[in-house]
Amino acid sequence: MAAVELEWIPETLYNTAISAVVDNYIRSRRDIRSLPENIQFDVYYKLYQQGRLCQLGSEFCELEVFAKVLRALDKRHLLHHCFQALMDHGVKVASVLAYSFSRRCSYIAESDAAVKEKAIQVGFVLGGFLSDAGWYSDAEKVFLSCLQLCTLHDEMLHWFRAVECCVRLLHVRNGNCKYHLGEETFKLAQTYMDKLSKHGQQANKAALYGELCALLFAKSHYDEAYKWCIEAMKEITAGLPVKVVVDVLRQASKACVVKREFKKAEQLIKHAVYLARDHFGSKHPKYSDTLLDYGFYLLNVDNICQSVAIYQAALDIRQSVFGGKNIHVATAHEDLAYSSYVHQYSSGKFDNALFHAERAIGIITHILPEDHLLLASSKRVKALILEEIAIDCHNKETEQRLLQEAHDLHLSSLQLAKKAFGEFNVQTAKHYGNLGRLYQSMRKFKEAEEMHIKAIQIKEQLLGQEDYEVALSVGHLASLYNYDMNQYENAEKLYLRSIAIGKKLFGEGYSGLEYDYRGLIKLYNSIGNYEKVFEYHNVLSNWNRLRDRQYSVTDALEDVSTSPQSTEEVVQSFLISQNVEGPSC
C-alpha cells in the first residue's frame, strides 16, 4: 500500500517529528508559525514539556501567535497548563497580551468597520480565555478595548457586539469583585438593548440577567438577585449556548438556596451539574463550577459530609486544569476549607480545613493586591478555624497567640467587607457575628454581646426574623448569655427561637440543633430544672438517631449522573412555580 493512502499517522512518528522541530527550534522558529494551529500548538506544548518556558513565553507574548494558538479549540485544557506555567514562572503573558491588544485597537480606530469587527472577534476569544483562566484584570482590559471599538460605529451590528461585550465585562468584574463598576456595565448593556428594541431587534438577555444575578448575590441583595434570576430563566430558549444555560441554572439555584427554597434549588443545580458533565466532560472547568455550587447547596441543606466530597472533586478538577497559583484553585481551596471546618466542628480535627484555608490565602496574596475583597472570606475562614484550635489548646501562651491571630484576621476581613459593601450588609453582619464569638473565646463578654446584637439587628432587617443567618447569631448570643454571663432567662428565649427557626427550615434532624439542645441541658442544670434536663436529653437522643439515618447512603455525584427531565422541563417547572410562563425551549 502506498504511503499516500494511509488514513492516519502513527502517534510515535508524529511525536518524533514534533520533537525534531523543537530540537531545531531556533532555526525553525519562523517556519513553525506557518504550520496549522493544531500542529503549531503541539510544538509549543513540547517546549512546555521540556521546561523551555523562556522560549515558550517569547512565543505566547506575541499577539498574532497566541491568537492563532487559541483557534486550536480541542487543546484548550493543555493550553491552560502552559499558560499557568508561564505565569508561575514570572512571565507576565496575560498582561503583555492585554496591553498588545489594547494598543492594536487604538491603532485601528480609523480603519474600516471590517477591520474593527475582526479585532473584536479576536478580543472576545482572547478575553474569554483570560477570563476562563482567572486573569480578570487583563480580561477586563481586553473587553474594554473591544467596547471602545464598538462605540466607534453607531450601527446595529455593533450594538449587538456591545451587548455581548458588556456581558463579558460584567462577568470579569464580578469575578474580580469590582461590583460598583458592574452596575455601570449592566446599565450600559441596557442602553444598547433599548436601541436594538427601538429598531425591532432583540438580543437574548439570559446571560446578561444571569450576570446581574451574580452581582446582586455577591452584594447580598438576595431578593433582587432572585427576581433577576426569574427574568434570566424566562430568557432560556432553544439554541442558547449550553454554557449560558448552565450558568443561569447555577445562579438561579444559589438564589433559591438563600431564599430557602431548597426543592427548587436542588432541581436547578442537579440539572446544571448533569448538563455541564454531559456537554463539557468531567474534567472541564465549567463542570467544576457547577460542582462548587452543588457543594454550596449541599452545605446549606445540612448534607455536610457530601458537600465536602463535592468540593474536593471540584478542587481536583481545577488543580488538574490550572494548577499553580490560580484564582480558581484558590476559591476551591477556600470552599473546601469552610465545609471541612463545619464537617469537623464537633470532632475538633481541623488540620485539613486549616491546610486549605492557608493555601487559599497564599495563592490570593501572591496574585492579587493585599486589600482585595477575595481575601476577606479566606481570612474569615482561617480565623474561624484558628479560634477552634485555640479553644482546644492546653498551652495558654499558644492559645492567646492563636486567638490574637484570629482577631487580626477577623478585623481585616471586617474592614474589607465594610469598604466594599458598607455597614448595612449581610456580609458585614457575618463578620460582626464572628467577632462576637471570638470575643467570647477571649473572655471579652461585653464586646461579644455588642457584636452579636449588631449582627442580629442587621440580619433581621435585611433577611427577616426567621432566616437561617438570624438563627445562627441568635444561637451564638444565647451561648454567650448561658455559658459566660449567667443570663439564663434571656438565653432560654434565644435558644428556643434558634431551635424553632432551624426546625422550620431544615427539619428535626438539622445539625445545628445539637448545640442549642446541649446549651439548654446546661442551662436547665444550672437553674436546677431537672425535669427539663431529662426532657432535652431525650430530645438530643432522638436527634442523634435521626442524624444516623440522614444522608447515610446517598452519593451526591451518583445522584446527578442522569437527569429525569429535559432542560425545557426544568425551566418550565421553575417558571410555573413562580406563576410565570417562559418561552419555549
Curated annotation (Swiss-Prot):
PROSITE patterns: TPR, TPR_REGION. TPR repeats lie at residues 50-83, 120-153, 206-239, 288-321, 333-367, 429-462, 471-505, 514-547. GO terms for molecular function: microtubule motor activity; ubiquitin-like ligase-substrate adaptor activity. It comes from the Eukaryota. SMART domains: TPR. It holds the Pfam family TPR_10. It is found in: Nucleus; Cytoplasm, Cytoskeleton; Membrane. E3 ubiquitin-protein ligase activity of the CRL2(APPBP2) complex is inhibited by APP. Keywords: Cytoplasm, Cytoskeleton, Membrane, Microtubule, Nucleus, Protein transport, Repeat, TPR repeat, Transport, Ubl conjugation pathway. InterPro entries: APPBP2, TPR-like_helical_dom_sf, TPR_rpt. Rapidly degraded by the proteasome upon overexpression of a C-terminal fragment of APP. Pathway: Protein modification; protein ubiquitination. It is a peripheral membrane protein. GO terms for biological process: intracellular protein transport; intracellular transport; proteasome-mediated ubiquitin-dependent protein catabolic process; protein ubiquitination. GO terms for cellular component: Cul2-RING ubiquitin ligase complex; cytoplasm; cytoplasmic vesicle membrane; microtubule; microtubule associated complex; nucleoplasm; nucleus. Substrate-recognition component of a Cul2-RING (CRL2) E3 ubiquitin-protein ligase complex of the DesCEND (destruction via C-end degrons) pathway, which recognizes a C-degron located at the extreme C terminus of target proteins, leading to their ubiquitination and degradation. The C-degron recognized by the DesCEND pathway is usually a motif of less than ten residues and can be present in full-length proteins, truncated proteins or proteolytically cleaved forms. Component of a CRL2 E3 ubiquitin-protein ligase complex, also named ECS (Elongin BC-CUL2/5-SOCS-box protein) complex, composed of CUL2, Elongin BC (ELOB and ELOC), RBX1 and substrate-specific adapter APPBP2. Interacts with APP; APP interaction inhibits the E3 ubiquitin-protein ligase activity of the CRL2(APPBP2) complex. This is Amyloid protein-binding protein 2. It comes from Homo sapiens (Human).
